[in-house]
UniProtKB/Swiss-Prot annotation:
<dbReference type="GO" id="GO:0050567">
    <property type="term" value="F:glutaminyl-tRNA synthase (glutamine-hydrolyzing) activity"/>
</dbReference>
<dbReference type="InterPro" id="IPR017958">
    <property type="entry name" value="Gln-tRNA_amidoTrfase_suB_CS"/>
</dbReference>
<dbReference type="GO" id="GO:0050566">
    <property type="term" value="F:asparaginyl-tRNA synthase (glutamine-hydrolyzing) activity"/>
</dbReference>
<protein>
    <recommendedName>
        <fullName>Aspartyl/glutamyl-tRNA(Asn/Gln) amidotransferase subunit B</fullName>
        <ecNumber>6.3.5.-</ecNumber>
    </recommendedName>
</protein>
<keyword id="KW-0547">Nucleotide-binding</keyword>
<dbReference type="Pfam" id="PF02637">
    <property type="entry name" value="GatB_Yqey"/>
</dbReference>
<dbReference type="InterPro" id="IPR006075">
    <property type="entry name" value="Asn/Gln-tRNA_Trfase_suB/E_cat"/>
</dbReference>
<dbReference type="GO" id="GO:0006412">
    <property type="term" value="P:translation"/>
</dbReference>
<keyword id="KW-0436">Ligase</keyword>
<dbReference type="InterPro" id="IPR017959">
    <property type="entry name" value="Asn/Gln-tRNA_amidoTrfase_suB/E"/>
</dbReference>
<keyword id="KW-0648">Protein biosynthesis</keyword>
<dbReference type="Pfam" id="PF02934">
    <property type="entry name" value="GatB_N"/>
</dbReference>
<comment type="subunit">
    <text>Heterotrimer of A, B and C subunits.</text>
</comment>
<dbReference type="InterPro" id="IPR023168">
    <property type="entry name" value="GatB_Yqey_C_2"/>
</dbReference>
<dbReference type="GO" id="GO:0005524">
    <property type="term" value="F:ATP binding"/>
</dbReference>
<comment type="similarity">
    <text>Belongs to the GatB/GatE family. GatB subfamily.</text>
</comment>
<keyword id="KW-0067">ATP-binding</keyword>
Length: 485
């Protein structure tokens, strides 16, 4: 059986994947959705827990306005319709790390619906976002030997559940969607998008159908995928598994699956519940959430330039390639750094230094641009020295490496190392004359048409001057001298 992007070639038919994603994004907020407990990460277990978070009798939820603002901000950035009226419901189920026995969510009337994200890499399409709603996160169970320990630090942290329509037809489309969603959430400051630490988690609903069939097959839900790589692997394996079941005469059951990262396979966790199993009903302790037009408009006005808009501007106004525009618009810290540099220097000089030298050095160190020892202002200073001919491009790379290592300015390093470029014709002309007079055979060959020997003479001059001679001036002087009789 072969799988080619979203089409699986079985023994009897070609099958098409149909995938929808449910993303749980932790809201950036100082306190939880319904309590004043802190949301700080990496604290000691059970040190950030309010009485409400563990369902102590008599405690009541108090809605965090900041979390509502963040959900509206996200909804607007994803082109959703924000509803002025929404309701919090109780989703009833038992699990040890859910102390109340129910999760407060929004089932019947979510805060937003009908948005989209545009894919433009692996394909060109709009992926519909069916709904966005606010809900509580659960605590965390830790299994050690035959014991289970509960940490309620995460219990009650605000989540935005962002639910897509079943519009994906390949793992690659799903992966691109998560990348773009994460870039948007980071750009608007509503979620840090850190999948490794669980602040962005993804469930994938996967089914298959024969190519050309419009009916949807029974779906499996793969829970808690914590990397884009694992998401793509899980979707592909589960789709192929379902095809094998169907082609062998079996029936795909609606089930909840787990993805084993060691074997890259999915396995059944339990039969998937229907909505009726959760017995949703409006939470009697919370009034409906009613938003005003002014509240929504104020948040809309505060939205920053979105990454897709920034990418378009970089391509149309600055003239960047699609590739460079994509890299430089995908992170707000990178964008700010780039715009500071390009305000002083042309893009064709600034871009290679940022995407080449700077990114290369940061990757080796494992650092982000926010932690770069070479600030945008320091890089501008270095490029000033290149532009005015003080140092050559080759020298600049040496200076940059020292800047990155020592955090000194370019001017200080050039002065300390004696790296100023030699741009005086009076200084270079005698060196050129001597090298040419010492190379009669090479001069004769050059004058007979072997013009590639120009590089030989340039190299000799550069070696003589320890690489400090201005290459352009050296070329001019050598050509002029060799043209003489």
């Amino acid at each position: 059986m072969a799988a080619n992007t979203g089409i699986i070639k079985g023994n009897t038919h070609e099958w098409e994947m149909v995938v929808g994603l449910e993303v749980h994004a932790q809201v950036i907020s100082n306190s939880k959705l319904f309590s004043g407990a802190s949301t700080g990460f990496c604290s000691e277990p059970n040190t950030q827990v309010a009485l409400f978070d563990v369902a102590m009798p008599g405690t009541l939820p108090v809605l965090n306005a900041r979390c509502v603002e963040q959900a509206v901000r996200t909804s607007l950035a994803l082109s959703c319709e924000v509803h002025k009226y929404s309701v919090f419901d109780r989703k009833n189920y038992f699990y040890p790390d859910l102390a109340s026995g129910y999760q407060i969510t929004q089932f019947y009337f979510p805060i937003a619906t009908d948005g989209y994200i545009t894919l433009d890499e692996c394909c060109s399409k709009d992926v519909r976002i069916s709904r966005i709603h606010l809900e509580q996160d659960a605590g965390k169970s830790m299994h050690v030997g035959d014991k289970t320990y509960l940490d309620f630090n995460r219990a009650g942290v605000a989540l935005m559940e962002i639910v897509s329509a079943p519009d994906f037809r390949s793992p690659e489309e799903a992966a691109e969607y998560i990348k773009k969603l994460r870039i948007i959430l980071r750009a608007i400051g509503t979620c840090d998008g850190d999948m490794e630490n669980g602040s962005l988690r993804c469930d994938a609903n996967v089914s298959v159908r024969k190519v050309g069939d419009s009916n949807l097959g029974a779906r499996s839900e793969i829970k808690n995928l914590n990397s884009i790589k694992h998401l793509a692997q899980a979707i592909r394996h589960e789709a192929c598994r379902q095809v094998e079941v169907l082609e062998s005469g079996g029936v795909v059951s609606q089930s909840t699956m787990l993805f084993d990262v060691d074997t890259c396979t999915t396995r059944s966790m339990r039969e998937k519940e229907d909505a009726c199993d959760y017995r949703y009903f409006p939470d009697p302790d919370l009034l409906p959430l009613e938003l005003t037009t002014a509240f929504i408009d104020n948040i809309r006005a505060s939205l920053p330039e979105l990454p897709s808009e920034k990418k378009r501007r970089y391509m149309q106004d600055i003239g960047l390639s699609r590739y460079d525009a994509d890299i430089l618009s995908s992170d707000k810290d990178v964008s700010a750094y780039f715009e500071s540099v390009v305000a002083k220097h042309a893009p064709d000089l600034a871009v290679p230094w940022i995407t080449g030298e700077l990114f290369g050095a940061l990757n080796k160190r494992g650092s982000s641009i926010a932690d770069s020892p070479v600030s945008a202002g320091r890089l501008v200073e270095l490029l000033d020295l290149v532009a005015d001919g003080t140092i050559s491009g080759k020298m600049a790379k040496q200076v940059f490496a020292l800047m990155f290592e020592t955090e000194k300015s370019a001017s200080d390093i050039v002065r300390e190392q004696g790296l100023c470029q030699i741009t005086s014709e009076e200084t270079l002309a005698p060196i050129v004359d001597r090298i040419i007079s010492e190379s009669p055979d090479e001069v004769a060959e050059y004058r007979q048409g072997k013009t590639k020997l120009l590089g030989y003479f340039v190299g000799k001059v550069m070696k003589e001057t320890n690489g400090q001679a201005n290459p352009g001036l050296v070329n001019t002087l050598i050509k002029r001298r060799l043209a003489e009789d």
